[in-house]
């Protein structure tokens, strides 16, 4: 039987260090309102802001948002085009806000497939925030977990081919060192919105020991309270004692003062 804990015993030490989020349900959210899918993608940007703000207030080390998977290229061309333009617009508009809040932005994925215009924006945004020491915000764009593992193994294969590495020396730690986000803690909490219960080729290696939290909320409806509820669930799972979203909100407020 679990017991409710007092706020004084709830510290930042029990919170997840790295949260991954599959932002799902933009299209269905828009459809429910009689709007085109792109309307949902634009509304989802506000949910991103709220989630980043909440994670930063809680002192989370890193948060990784699944913005565009390598499979998303199969969507209708018009929708993909709108998503790319939205990505450019959001990067241009939000990067100064991120920088002001000491947030370091990283774009992970096969970015070479993006337009030169978008690649330039990515480099500019990452460069501006590269020295920031607060929350690390990873945006997974044209990313897939299989791709990440493949590129890591390929890099090691090149080293073996050149005679700089023996095949027998390859172990889990060496592979992990070649993955994206290798300098960050492994994911301990994965959140997926919209009621879907799958990980969709997202961070397959890094989420090996993560707790999975699924919510029926569509992504545009996700907010600070939503993240607080997910983190409270994580604390209850990890520490085997009761925790509420209100307690997590109280921690946010303490950080905000």
UniProtKB/Swiss-Prot annotation:
Residues that, per the record, bind substrate: 25-29, 37, 41, 69-71, 73, 75, 192, 198-200
Catalytic activity: 8 isopentenyl diphosphate + (2E,6E)-farnesyl diphosphate = di-trans,octa-cis-undecaprenyl diphosphate + 8 diphosphate
GO biological process: cell wall organization; peptidoglycan biosynthetic process; polyprenol biosynthetic process; regulation of cell shape
EC number: 2.5.1.31
Listed InterPro entries: UPP_synth-like (IPR001441), UPP_synth-like_CS (IPR018520), UPP_synth-like_sf (IPR036424)
Group of enzyme by EC: transferase
Keywords: Cell shape, Cell wall biogenesis/degradation, Magnesium, Metal-binding, Peptidoglycan synthesis, Transferase
The keyword Magnesium is annotated on this UniProt entry: yes
Entry's cofactor comment: Binds 2 magnesium ions per subunit.
Domain of life: Bacteria
Cofactor names: Mg(2+)
GO molecular function, one term: magnesium ion binding
Subunit note: Homodimer.
Family stated for the protein in its record: Belongs to the UPP synthase family.
Name of the protein: Ditrans,polycis-undecaprenyl-diphosphate synthase ((2E,6E)-farnesyl-diphosphate specific)
Organism this protein belongs to: Aliivibrio fischeri (strain ATCC 700601 / ES114) (Vibrio fischeri)
């Amino acid at each position: 039987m679990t017991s409710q804990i007092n706020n004084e015993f709830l510290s930042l030490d029990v919170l997840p260090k790295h949260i991954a989020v599959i932002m799902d349900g933009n299209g269905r959210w828009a459809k429910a309102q009689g709007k085109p899918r792109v309307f949902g993608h634009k509304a989802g940007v506000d949910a991103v802001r709220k989630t980043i703000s909440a994670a930063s207030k809680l002192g989370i080390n890193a948060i990784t948002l699944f913005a565009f998977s390598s499979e998303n290229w199969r969507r209708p061309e018009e929708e993909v085009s709108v998503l790319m333009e939205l990505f450019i617009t959001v990067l241009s508009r939000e990067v100064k806000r991120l920088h002001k809040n000491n947030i370091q932005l990283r774009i992970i994925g096969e970015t070479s497939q993006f337009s030169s215009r978008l690649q330039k924006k990515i480099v500019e945004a990452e460069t501006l925030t590269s020295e920031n020491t607060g929350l690390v915000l990873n945006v997974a764009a044209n990313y897939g977990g299989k791709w990440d593992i493949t590129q890591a193994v390929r890099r090691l294969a090149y080293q073996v081919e050149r005679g700089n590495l023996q095949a027998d020396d390859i172990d889990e730690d060496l592979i992990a060192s070649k993955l994206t986000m290798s300098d960050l803690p492994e994911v301990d909490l994965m959140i997926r919105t919209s009621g879907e219960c799958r990980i969709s080729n997202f961070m397959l290696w890094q989420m090996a020991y993560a707790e999975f939290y699924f919510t029926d909320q569509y992504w545009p409806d996700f907010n600070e309270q939503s993240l607080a509820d997910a983190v409270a669930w994580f604390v209850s799972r990890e520490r085997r004692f009761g925790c509420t979203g209100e307690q997590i909100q109280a921690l946010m407020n303490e950080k905000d003062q």
